[in-house]
Amino acid sequence: MEKLTTLTGVGVPLRRSNVDTDQIIPAVFLKRVTKSGFDDALFYAWRRDPNFVLNKPEYAGKGQILVAGPEFGIGSSREHAVWALHDYGFRVVIAPSFADIFYGNTAKNGVLAAIMPQESVELLWKLLEEEPGREMTVSLETRTVTCGDVTLPFEVNDYVRWRLMNGYDDIDLTLQHEDDIAAYEKMRAEKFPFKPKTIPAKHWPEEKIESAREPDDDWTGPLADRGII
């Protein structure tokens, strides 16, 4: 996963509260079997409106920092919501509050969910709307957002901050314990040699396997009448 320490990019003001995951990416797009390529599905219903913020030339395909209202990412649990934001280009989402599951999914996928007071978000909206296409700088090192001459602090979980700054996804974290895992597997194989094994399909068990009905059985009545069930 790509490291995130400091990001300078176009800030996008999204003056909407209680944005749920179905608004971020409709369920119809969840049928895809890949983890990427969801940028076209981000805010799909809203982007059909020509006046939606991401359809404005100052923001279309350029946004990297999204500034939204409280309770962002509520609704059903779908990691696709974070994938869609990331695929579009957003590495940071700023809001007064986030849904817990969505917040957890951001860190796993290289997106920072930065928590700011409502008054700070309102100020950022004002600054971004006064100068569409304006760039902002987000620093995980100092936990601050700078927009023009204004610098504001944000909150981020220490563990989330550590993961993002080091670019650790779940696989990276697991591989840090590779030696411990190998040692445990070795110990388990030696101490518990009777662990169950799956029989390969080409080998048949020695005992005969009886079926409920033999191939030459012509019984057509209910199985219950034969005492089988």
From Swiss-Prot:
Residues 208-229 are annotated as: Disordered. Keywords: Amino-acid biosynthesis, Branched-chain amino acid biosynthesis, Leucine biosynthesis, Lyase. GO terms for biological process: L-leucine biosynthetic process. CDD domains: IPMI_Swivel (cd01577). Its EC number is 4.2.1.33. It catalyses: (2R,3S)-3-isopropylmalate = (2S)-2-isopropylmalate. It comes from the Bacteria. One of its GO terms (molecular function) is 3-isopropylmalate dehydratase activity. One of its GO terms (cellular component) is 3-isopropylmalate dehydratase complex. Pathway: Amino-acid biosynthesis; L-leucine biosynthesis; L-leucine from 3-methyl-2-oxobutanoate: step 2/4. InterPro entries: 3-IsopropMal_deHydase_ssu, Aconitase/3IPM_dehydase_swvl, AconitaseA/IPMdHydase_ssu_swvl, IPMI_Swivel, LeuD. SUPFAM superfamilies: LeuD/IlvD-like (SSF52016). Belongs to the LeuD family. LeuD type 1 subfamily. Catalyzes the isomerization between 2-isopropylmalate and 3-isopropylmalate, via the formation of 2-isopropylmaleate. Heterodimer of LeuC and LeuD. This is 3-isopropylmalate dehydratase small subunit. The lineage of its organism: Bacteria, Bacillati, Actinomycetota, Actinomycetes, Bifidobacteriales. The gene is leuD.
